[in-house]
Amino acid sequence: MKRPLRIAAWTLAVALLALASATAARFWFLHWQPDRERYPLRGIDVSHHQGAIDWRAVAADDVAFVYLKVSEGGDHRDRRFADNWRQARAAGLAVGAYHFFTFCRPGAEQARNFIDAVPVEADALPPAVDLEFGGNCGLRPDAARMRAQLDAFLAPTEATYGKPALLYVTPEFFDAYREALPARALWRRSILHAPDARAPWAVWQYHNRARVAGIVGPVDLNVYAGDAAALERWRGGARAVGAR
């Protein structure tokens, strides 16, 4: 074989190998999940960014629970929440609502925003609070002020729904405020690897670009720390598996 042909052949082989490796890596990324025997219950969290959702298709695609964004700050409401809440419940999913907590509005004001939008349903999942820096305002309160405003949100919210709230925390937020967090079940974000052992968790968000039937585009995936019976008890107000 002439040298130019050999070079071309090797170049093609390397390119094909790189393409195959990239394809395999993408497949692994899109389909990676925790041990299903250990964590059998899979869930999603969504907002208006996922658009119109076919909830029956979601329920048929091995999804057991869902958290829906309902509110943010003191006055923002997710425009798809009411439809998502009604349709996801009708599809037989365990459904909860979450609030994106902002540092720039009083906690009590944010609680009113959440409570005014979320129905009181005995079988709903506990209310959840999204605590993170991404997408938040520029303020970075000290631990005492953050805790005071979070408590101002939690007190009326938990009194209204009769269940301890679930706290969603990113690694960055957890590092900054770990010692100031109240003793509540944690929903920990840890993409493609298990959360560290610093604190137990009830819900683990393990993927942020997954695909689920009934949803156009990527979606977050989660697992619950217990089995179906434990999830049902948690819906009823019992202590979450993995709660601190």
Tell where the protein language model's regions lie, with residue ranges.
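Hydrophobic membrane-insertion alpha-helices, especially the h-region
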Residues: R6-F27
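Boundary/entry segment of secreted carbohydrate-active catalytic domains
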Residues: A20-E72
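Substrate-binding cleft of extracellular glycoside hydrolase catalytic domains
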Residues: R36-G51, V70-A152, E158-T160
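Functionally critical loop-and-helix segments that line ligand-binding/catalytic clefts
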Residues: D35-G51, R56, L181-R244
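Structural preference for beta-strand elements that scaffold enzyme active sites
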Residues: L41-G43, A64-F65, A94-G96, A124-A128, ...
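Aromatic-lined carbohydrate-recognition surfaces of secreted/lumenal glycan-active proteins
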Residues: E158-D175
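Structural recognition of alpha->loop->beta junctions
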Residues: I115-V129, F133, R178-W201
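N-terminal Lys/Arg-rich, disordered targeting/topogenic segments
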Residues: M1-L5
